Amino acid sequence: MFGIVNSMSYICGMKNQLPYCKTSEAIKGYSESSIAKNETNDCVVKSIASGFEIDYDRAHQIVKEQFNRKDKKGTFGFIPKMNSMSESRERIGRKCFQIMGKKSIYGYSYSLSYNTIVKGEIVKRQMTVGTFIKKHPKGTFIVCVKSHAFTIKDGVVIGNKEDAIQKRKIIQSAWKVGS
């Protein structure tokens, strides 16, 4: 009986989660990389590698040089730097990328908010990961939520397992790769 309950909760749990691919399967050279084995706080490196289809070690080098990332320390200022690179049409691994959303009135950030109707009233909502995938089922996107980055490729989340489970996380910024 316990096994049936366990398998049923697993099946039901799958319904509430987005399609997910392990970084080790999605990133070229990830499993073989000695750098990856010793690295922590490398979500930006993983998102660049999977989003731009380059190997992990090359992505690590790019993030270190372009974003001034220190080993095992995370990437600070990622969103403004990506926006700046996108606006100046710089490429990463031979691919261009485009900022998603509308430019804010302050001019330095972009908003992915949208209007929806709730009980006859127009309400402004912040874009969540789940809504983003519904609105953008095809394409490759680098996505930032609070203090974290990952890739969404053709509706499949590439990053940490939690990224596919936490569908209601608000997206702070996103870039479409290859546009």
PLM ranges: what are they?
Residues 8, 18, 28, 104-108, ...:
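Intrinsically disordered, low-complexity segments enriched in small/polar residues
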Residues 13-79, 95, 99-100:
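Active-site nucleophile-adjacent alpha helix/oxyanion-hole segment immediately C-terminal to the catalytic cysteine
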Residues 70-147, 153-155, 160-162:
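Conserved active-site-adjacent core of cysteine acyl-enzyme catalytic domains
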Residues 159-179:
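Noncatalytic regulatory segments and standalone regulatory/sensor domains
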